[in-house]
Regions:
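Active-site-adjacent "subsite" loops/lids of carbohydrate-active enzymes
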Residues: 90-103, 107-109, 169, 180, ...
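An active-site-proximal structural segment forming one wall of the substrate-binding cleft
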Residues: 111-114, 120-127, 170, 212-247, ...
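Catalytic domains of carbohydrate-active enzymes, especially glycoside hydrolases
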Residues: 116-140, 235-241, 321, 395-402
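Aromatic-lined carbohydrate-binding/catalytic grooves of carbohydrate-active enzymes
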Residues: 125-159, 251-258
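Glycoside hydrolase catalytic-domain groove-lining segments
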Residues: 263-295, 299-376, 422
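Substrate-binding cleft of secreted/luminal carbohydrate-active enzymes
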Residues: 319-331, 345-350, 355, 359-446
C-alpha cells in the first residue's frame, strides 16, 4: 500500500515534509538545532506507518544539523506545457531553460559562509537555482518586514536573513535563479494570535489534530491575503518565483476531522486549494512572477482527494509549476509493486512522474512538473551519489527536465550533480537495488515488478486515507529529510 506523505516542510513542498525549524535566539545556530524544514513533506510519499510518524510533509523534523554558523553574516514535461510566467520586469533573474535547484533553509540563507559554499557548489555543477525560505513552518518571516499582520502576531521576532536584498544581489551576480518558499497552513504564530483564522472545533475554539497541531483554515480569505501580501513584498524585492508550501488541508486521521469545522466553507477542499492558487496568481500577475506549489507526491498517482484538497487535475492548470515530493523513502512497502521502495529510487521516481506526465497531458494549460528529490537518508540504503543521481536520471527518463533537491540542513551530495562540462565517466546509479553505470539502467528495469496503473492508484488512494505522514522524529533520520 502507498501512503501519502507530504514537506514539506511542511510541506518541499514541499516544497513541505520536515518543515520544523528549531527556534534559535541570536545570530549563531548551534549544532543541536533541529533544522528540519522540509517542504510540506508533501511529497510523494507512501510511508510505512510502522516506521514513520506523521506526514513528512507536515512537520517532519528531520535532522539535527547546523544550518548556519557562529557569526552569521547577514549580507548575505508535460506535452507542450504552458510556459511559466516571465521573470521580474527588471530582468535581473531570467528563468533558466531548465530549473535545477537546491533548498536553502533560512539559517543557511542568512549565513555568508554557507551561502558562499553553496554558490561554489553551483559554480562547479549543473545547479542554477536556490529555493530560499521566506516563511517556514515555524511561522517566522526570515527577513525584516513591516507587514502589519506579521508584526502583530510576532512573526518578525526571529530574523534569519538580515539583508535579503543583499542576498538577492549576490545571487544575481552568481547567475542563480532565486525562488521564495512560503509555508501557508502550518503557522503556529498566526493560529495562536488569530485563532479565528484557524480550523474551528465543534466544541468551540480552534481545532487541533491528535498531535496538538492547530491548522489554518484554507477557506479563510484573511489567511490568503496575509500570505499574498508577503509574496508581493518579496516579489517587489526581486524574487521571480513564489513557491507555496503546505498549501493544503491537515492530513490528520478521519477521527480527528470529525470535530473540525471550516467557517467560510465554499465548495470542496480541492475547490478551496484551487481557489487560493488561482487568486494568488491573479493578485501577483502584475509583478510578472511565476506562482508554484509544493504538493504531496501521492497526488501524481491518487485519483481522488485523499483529504488534503490536492487533486492533480484541480490545481495543475492554475500554477506555473507543480512540485510533487516524490521521495522514495516515503513510499509504502508494495508501492508500484516494489517491496522496498527506498532501495529503488530510480523506479519509484520514474513511476510517480510518469503518472504526472500522463495526467497533465489531458489538461489544457497544465503547468510544468518539477519534482522535489531526496538528498537525505531515511532508512536503508544510505542515500549517497548513486541514489540521488538515480532520481535525477529517472526524472529525465520520465520526460521531465527540472528538479530540486531537498535536504533540511541544506547539505548536498556534490558527486550526484553533473559537473560543468559533463561527467568524465558514466555516473553510477542505483537501479534494481544494484549499483550500475547509468547507461546500463534499461538492462535492469524490466526485472522490477510492477502493478497495473489502476491498481496502483487504488492502493495509493486507500493508504493515503489511513496513514498520517506529518512528521518524522529527528532521531529516525540519517542525514536529513524533508
Amino acid at each position: 500500500m502507498l501512503l501519502a506523505v507530504a514537506f514539506v516542510a511542511g510541506c518541499k513542498a514541499g516544497p513541505s515534509a520536515f518543515d520544523n525549524v528549531g527556534s534559535v535566539e541570536g545570530d549563531s545556530v548551534p549544532d543541536s538545532v533541529a533544522v528540519a524544514t522540509l517542504v510540506d513533506t508533501p511529497s510523494i510519499a507512501l510511508l510505512d506507518p510502522a516506521t514513520v510518524g506523521p506526514d513528512v510533509d507536515s512537520a517532519a523534523v528531520v535532522s539535527e544539523e547546523s544550518a548556519g554558523e557562529e557569526g552569521v553574516d547577514a549580507e548575505v514535461s508535460t506535452p507542450r506545457p504552458r510556459a511559466p510566467s516571465p521573470a521580474m520586469a527588471d530582468g535581473r533573474f531570467p528563468r533558466p531553460e531548465h530549473v535545477r535547484g537546491i533548498y536553502l533553509n533560512a539559517w543557511a540563507s542568512g549565513s555568508r559562509n554557507r551561502v558562499n559554499a553553496l554558490l561554489e557548489l553551483a559554480a562547479q555543477t549543473e545547479v542554477n537555482s536556490f529555493v530560499i525560505d521566506i516563511k517556514d513552518a515555524s511561522g517566522y518571516i526570515s527577513h525584516p518586514t513591516d507587514l502589519p499582520v506579521a508584526v502583530e502576531v510576532g512573526a518578525t521576532e526571529e530574523v534569519r536573513i538580515r539583508d535579503l536584498p543583499g542576498l538577492l544581489n549576490r545571487l544575481d551576480s552568481a547567475g542563480i535563479y532565486p525562488i521564495a518558499r512560503i509555508v501557508i497552513v502550518k503557522d503556529p504564530l498566526l493560529s495562536a494570535a488569530k485563532p479565528d483564522y484557524a480550523v474551528q472545533d465543534m466544541a468551540g475554539g480552534a481545532w487541533a489534530d491528535s498531535k496538538g497541531i492547530v491548522w489554518l483554515n484554507p477557506y479563510n480569505k484573511d489567511v490568503w491575503d496575509y500570505h499574498v501580501d508577503l509574496a508581493r513584498e518579496v516579489a517587489e524585492m526581486g524574487f521571480p518565483e513564489i513557491q507555496w508550501d503546505y498549501v493544503r488541508f491537515a492530513d490528520a486521521p478521519a477521527s480527528d476531522h470529525a470535530r473540525a469545522t471550516y467557517p467560510g466553507e465554499n465548495g470542496s477542499k480541492a475547490d478551496a486549494i484551487r481557489a487560493f492558487l488561482d487568486y494568488s496568481r491573479q493578485e501577483l500577475a502584475e509583478l510578472g512572477v511565476a506562482v508554484t506549489a509544493d504538493v504531496f507526491g501521492v497526488t501524481t498517482t491518487a485519483r481522488r482527494d485523499v483529504g488534503i484538497g490536492q487533486v492533480w487535475e484541480s490545481f495543475i492548470d492554475v500554477v506555473d509549476v507543480a512540485l510533487p515530493m516524490v521521495y522514495p523513502s516515503h513510499y509504502w512497502k508494495g508501492s508500484f509493486g516494489i517491496d522496498t521502495p527506498n532501495a529503488y529510487p530510480y523506479e519509484i521516481v520514474k513511476a510517480a512522474l510518469r503518472d504526472a506526465v500522463k495526467r497533465s497531458a489531458d489538461i489544457e494549460g497544465a503547468g510544468i512538473t518539477r519534482p522535489w528529490l531526496q538528498d537525505f537518508t531515511l532508512g536503508a540504503p544510505r542515500y549517497e551519489a548513486p541514489e540521488v543521481r538515480a532520481q535525477i536520471q529517472a526524472t529525465y527518463d520520465a520526460g521531465l527536465h527540472e528538479w530540486i533537491l531537498w535536504n533540511p540542513g541544506s547539505h548536498y551530495t556534490e558527486d550526484a550533480l553533473e559537473p560543468i562540462g559533463g561527467f568524465v565517466t558514466d555516473p553510477i546509479i542505483r537501479v534494481g537495488n544494484e549499483l550500475i553505470p547509468a547507461s546500463q539502467r534499461y538492462e535492469l528495469t524490466d526485472t522490477v515488478p510492477a502493478v497495473p496503473e489502476e491498481l496502483a492508484a487504488e492502493v495509493v488512494d486507500t493508504a493515503a486515507t489511513t496513514i498520517r505522514v506529518d512528521t518524522i522524529p529527528v532521531d529516525t533520520i540519517g542525514g536529513g529529510t524533508r
